[in-house]
Every structure is written in C-alpha cells, then in structure tokens.
Regions:
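Conserved PLP-enzyme active-site core in the AAT-like
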Residues: 1-184
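Conserved PLP-dependent catalytic core of the aminotransferase class-I/II
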Residues: 15, 173-174, 178-238
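Long alpha-helical, hydrophobic tracts
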Residues: 21-23, 27, 299-307
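Structural alpha-beta junctions
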Residues: 90-97, 219-226, 307
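Short acidic (Asp/Glu) and glycine-rich catalytic loops that position anionic groups and cofactors
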Residues: 103-104, 153-159, 186-196, 243-248, ...
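A common structural junction motif
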Residues: 165-166, 268-275, 304-307
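Short, amphipathic alpha-helical "lid/cap" segments that border enzyme active or binding sites
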Residues: 174, 178, 295-299, 303
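Conserved C-terminal alpha-helix-loop-beta "cap" of PLP-dependent enzymes
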Residues: 208-293, 298
Length: 307
C-alpha cells in the first residue's frame, strides 16, 4: 500500500494474473492496488505469463510493474513466469520501478541451516528489483511489521509519503526487530538465538523424547481418561510460508471419550491457554511449536486443565 501510493499513485500498475494473491484477513492484491490510488492492469494467464505480456501493456501512464511472490501457495504443472532479471531490464528500459512484494521473506540461506530452500531478499535485489517488501515476523522470526528495502532514491520518496508516518512502527517494534536481526550475524547465532529457526530445527526424535518424558510425569488417571499418546506428525511452517514443505514433528494426541472440539475449547479457555488442532477427529498439541523454556509450563497446564 505504502510503496504503491508513494511510487505510482494515479497511474497504472501492471501485475500478472497468477500473482493476484490473497493473504490473511481476506486482504487481496487487487484491493490493495485500488486503495493505494493506482489502477491495476493484469497481464498473462493464471498459469503462464510472458515478458511480451508486460511490454504490451506499458504506456505513458504506467507507474510500476508489481511482482507478488506467491509465498502462501504454489502453482505447479504447465506453468511459466518471467525471470526477475528480464523484468528488471524491461523496467529500466521503460524507466519505471519494479516493485516486489516478497510476502514472508527470508534473509538467510535456509539450506545452510538445514531447511528447505527459499529465495532470499538479497537475491531479489541483485536480480534487479527496485524495492522489495517482506514481513518482519513469519520466516524472519521477529515482530509483526512490514520491511521495505531497495534503491535509496525510492526509499527516500517512500519515507516522505504522509502514509509512512501513519504506518510507521513504534519503538518497541524497532527494538525487537533489531534484536532479531542481530541473531543473523552468524549461523551459530541464528540457530541458538532465533526462536523461529530453533523451533524449525528441533528433530522429530528430540520432540518424541520430550513428549514421552512429559507424559510420564502426568498422573496415570489423566493419561488413561483422555487417551493421551505421543505420536509422530508432520507440520507446516504456517503464516503463509513454505506452503509445500512438511516438517517432521511429534504431538500429544488425545483419543479419550471427550470430543475433540470440546477438548479444544477446554484448553483455549484455560487461564494459561494452550492452542492445538484437530486431525482425524482427535485433538493434537504439537510439540514443534513449544519452546524448551515452556515445557514445564505445558506440563503444569496439562495437569491443571485435565484434572
């Protein structure tokens, strides 16, 4: 919204039909473009868009080319999209900015951290994007915020837009974001200090061991009454990130007489709420989302909620 309003207000913004994404809260790219004061020009088809499609729609009133990275879904099969380097060359030729909404955003090489590959912000900037926006939470592991980086001249223009003052973060958000970014200084810091990366990297064997240890400490009557078992599971990153990837995990599975929906409400309404999910008509509490510092609290919550 801020990028488009600052760089292309009153002009046309070109975007591929296959990139008109919807994010959480039913916010859609076409609505954001309209709200920013721009007119959306869609090109290509849902599964295929070519460079010529973009070039054919560029006019004197074109304000920008927008690329929205589909971080919360993937189109597979008979598909084709334009390389960012080619779009960058076209945008430079026509003297219009190339704006990239990266969505979740990654600033580290995930494969070096033992995680699935995800293109980095740096790689998109090197490929020629004029400005790139991404989330401060999700894959980055920080506070909920939007981050914009790119060419200095365009960033200055965005910074001077009145919307910037209305949308700027508070000091607490900046402080948390700074602390999060400092964890990326070395690979060791990321794995030890960044909670998101720590949770991603906990192995299934480790989680199974933790789960069984907690179950042993529960009163036997609670375990029997609620049919609590520790089982292997697969989980997703969530927050619209890495949509095709599954992460091996382990969970408490409740297979007792109480209905899964009722059990879920019981946990959510507790003084210290515990959020789980329902799968195969059983309530699950997945250990992939439980930091090591909260394992004792989880045990206490299980006892107080179920006794």
């Amino acid at each position: 919204l801020l990028m488009l309003n600052a760089l292309a207000e009153g002009k046309e913004v070109i975007i591929s039909r296959g990139e008109q994404v919807e994010i959480g809260g039913s916010f859609r790219i076409p609505d954001v473009i309209k709200k920013s004061g721009c007119k959306m020009i869609e090109v290509g088809t849902t599964n295929k868009t070519h460079l010529q499609d973009y070039e054919n729609e560029i006019t004197p009133i074109t304000g920008a080319i927008l690329v929205a990275h589909t971080s919360n879904y993937k189109v597979m099969g008979f598909t084709e999209s334009v390389k960012l380097s080619e779009l960058s060359a076209l945008a430079k030729k026509k003297k219009i900015p190339l704006i990239l909404d990266l969505g979740s955003g990654a600033i580290a090489d995930f494969q070096k951290l033992g995680l699935p590959h995800e293109p980095t912000v740096q790689s998109y900037l090197k490929s020629g994007a004029s400005v790139v926006s991404f989330s401060g939470d999700k894959l980055l592991g920080g506070p909920q915020a939007g981050i914009i980086c790119g060419k200095k001249t365009l960033i200055r223009k965005i910074h001077k837009n009145p919307l910037y003052r209305a949308l700027r973060c508070d000091k607490f958000t900046y402080a948390i974001l700074e602390a999060t970014l400092r964890t990326y200084l070395t690979p060791i810091d990321i794995q030890k200090e960044n909670l998101t990366m720590t949770l991603f990297n906990r192995s299934q064997a480790e989680l199974l061991k933790i789960g069984k240890k907690i179950v042993k400490k529960l009163p036997r009557k609670i375990v029997d009454k609620f049919g609590i078992e520790v089982e292997q599971t697969e989980v997703e990153a969530g927050s619209g990130s890495l949509p095709l990837e599954k992460f091996p995990s382990a969970a408490f599975v409740f297979n007792g007489e109480m209905k899964a929906s009722e059990l879920g409400r019981k946990f959510r309404s507790a003084p210290n709420p515990v959020l789980g999910y329902i799968s195969d008509n059983c309530f699950h509490i997945d250990l992939k989302a439980i930091p090591a510092t909260q394992e004792k609290q989880l045990l206490s919550s299980l006892i107080s909620i179920l006794q």
